[in-house]
């Protein structure tokens, strides 16, 4: 079977740039890779065809020979000047081309040429701590002491993992690269070194305290400043208070996530507070004053307008929560709840019945409601 044109295989024009060739190759190779096409028996042959085409067109000399002589340039019939370095059958050149692109596609799985070893010094992991505070503490701000279990640098070996603090030595398996290579079929696979776990170094005489880890588990007490205005979900970062680093690497950070407990009197909405205050029927009808508590521990007297109903809201400006990053404070919203009296005496019941007879014209909302009900039923029967 005649070979297809290499440009056709990659789906590019003959004037395609090196970047366009590489982009086309990456797309085709990713699409046709055998690992992703286990149920397609033709995928492997197409995959090899794509790699063969790119192996030629990525090389300036091979490309020039192909543009001039076509496939004949690599079939052995041309003179030495026409053969530009061999074709698909030369595994070294092909593996080089394959590795260049697949290093981008699969990261550490495919190794490029001249890859660097993993950094020997590793930063420690970040830690999370959930801290609950009261609404009063969130209002004022508070200093809290917390106990955090974490890995810290071993004092016996100064974090090196070696007995007596001796330095680690270069790993003999990977020669300090942290990776080892293996030939699989027509390409090279690069994996993390199993001896040093990618560190590039090993400890000959492990520390007896930390067993070569360079870290030990320990609970630490930390003092944390909780600023005024925090709310549930607020995150506080303590730099360098996370897990200890490896091989002299920096420690991670500790992130404290705040949860504000519910309050018996106040509900919170951002910087605003909400308080439901019960009032008597007499106070709601005649008007008056009610004393309401405030989050700062004090109280404020609030005037109740005559004729107030349940659900009426009044605002105390500046009596809410402080803004976390400055900018004043929110408000406190007071909602009235008109309270129905219970456990009435005979005299109280008598007075209420008399009051009801005298108040037919004093209940506009009820009058309006029953008028609407009458209209509804008239419409149903009419």
Curated annotation (Swiss-Prot):
Keywords in alphabetical order: Chaperone, Cytoplasm, DNA replication, Metal-binding, Repeat, Stress response, Zinc, Zinc-finger
Binding positions for Zn(2+) 2 per the UniProt entry: 171, 174, 193, 196
Co-factor remark: Binds 2 Zn(2+) ions per monomer.
Record-level GO BP terms: chaperone cofactor-dependent protein refolding; DNA replication; protein refolding; response to heat
MF terms (GO), sorted A to Z: ATP binding; heat shock protein binding; unfolded protein binding; zinc ion binding
Localization terms from the record: Cytoplasm
Principal cellular location given in the protein's record: cytoplasm
Pfam families assigned to the protein according to its UniProt record, in alphabetical order: DnaJ, DnaJ_C, DnaJ_CXXCXGXG
Family matches, as SMART domains: DnaJ
J domain segment(s): 5-70
Binding site for Zn(2+) 1: 154, 157, 207, 210
InterPro entries: DnaJ, DnaJ_C, DnaJ_domain, DnaJ_domain_CS, HSP40/DnaJ_pept-bd, HSP_DnaJ_Cys-rich_dom, HSP_DnaJ_Cys-rich_dom_sf, J_dom_sf
Zinc finger (CR-type): 141-219
Domain of life: Bacteria
Positions of CXXCXGXG motif repeats: 154-161, 171-178, 193-200, 207-214
Cofactor: Zn(2+)
GO cellular component: cytoplasm
SUPFAM superfamilies: Chaperone J-domain, DnaJ/Hsp40 cysteine-rich domain, HSP40/DnaJ peptide-binding domain
Function noted in UniProt: Participates actively in the response to hyperosmotic and heat shock by preventing the aggregation of stress-denatured proteins and by disaggregating proteins, also in an autonomous, DnaK-independent fashion. Unfolded proteins bind initially to DnaJ; upon interaction with the DnaJ-bound protein, DnaK hydrolyzes its bound ATP, resulting in the formation of a stable complex. GrpE releases ADP from DnaK; ATP binding to DnaK triggers the release of the substrate protein, thus completing the reaction cycle.
Domain description: The J domain is necessary and sufficient to stimulate DnaK ATPase activity. Zinc center 1 plays an important role in the autonomous, DnaK-independent chaperone activity of DnaJ. Zinc center 2 is essential for interaction with DnaK and for DnaJ activity.
Subunit organization: Homodimer.
Family: Belongs to the DnaJ family.
Name used for this protein in its record: Chaperone protein DnaJ
């Amino acid at each position: 079977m005649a070979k297809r044109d290499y440009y056709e295989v990659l789906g590019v024009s003959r004037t395609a740039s090196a970047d366009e060739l590489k982009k086309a190759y990456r797309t085709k190779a990713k699409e046709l890779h055998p690992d992703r096409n286990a149920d397609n028996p033709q995928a492997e042959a197409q995959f090899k065809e794509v790699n063969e085409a790119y192996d030629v067109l990525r090389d300036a000399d091979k490309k020039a020979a192909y543009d001039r002589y076509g496939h004949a340039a690599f079939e052995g019939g041309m003179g030495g000047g026409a053969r530009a370095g061999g074709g698909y059958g030369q595994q070294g050149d092909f593996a080089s081309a394959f590795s260049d692109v697949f290093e981008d596609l699969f990261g550490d799985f495919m190794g490029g040429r001249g890859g660097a070893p993993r950094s020997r010094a590793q930063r420690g992991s970040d830690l999370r701590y959930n801290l609950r505070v009261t609404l009063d503490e969130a209002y004022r701000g508070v200093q809290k002491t917390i106990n955090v279990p974490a890995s810290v640098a071993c004092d016996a070996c100064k974090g090196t993992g070696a007995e007596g603090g001796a330095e680690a030595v270069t790993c003999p398996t990977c020669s300090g690269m942290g990776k080892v290579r293996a030939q699989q079929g027509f390409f090279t696979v690069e994996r993390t070194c199993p001896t040093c776990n990618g560190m590039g170094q090993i400890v000959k005489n492990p520390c007896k305290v930390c067993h070569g880890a360079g870290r030990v588990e320990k609970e630490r007490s930390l003092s944390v400043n909780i600023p005024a205005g925090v709310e549930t979900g607020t995150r506080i970062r303590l730099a360098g208070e996370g897990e200890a680093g490896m091989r002299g690497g920096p420690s991670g950070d500790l992130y404290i996530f705040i949860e504000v407990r519910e309050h018996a009197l106040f509900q919170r909405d951002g910087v605003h507070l909400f308080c439901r205050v019960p009032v008597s029927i007499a106070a709601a009808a005649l008007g008056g004053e009610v004393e309401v508590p405030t989050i700062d521990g004090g109280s404020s007297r609030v005037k109740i307008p005559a004729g107030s109903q349940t659900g009426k809201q009044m605002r105390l400006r500046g009596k809410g929560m402080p803004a976390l990053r400055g900018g004043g404070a929110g408000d406190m919203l007071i909602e009235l709840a008109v309270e129905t009296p219970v456990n009435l005496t005979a005299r109280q019941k008598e007075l209420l019945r008399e009051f009801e007879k005298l108040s037919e014209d004093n209940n506009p909302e009820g009058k309006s409601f029953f008028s609407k009900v009458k209209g509804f039923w008239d419409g149903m029967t009419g």
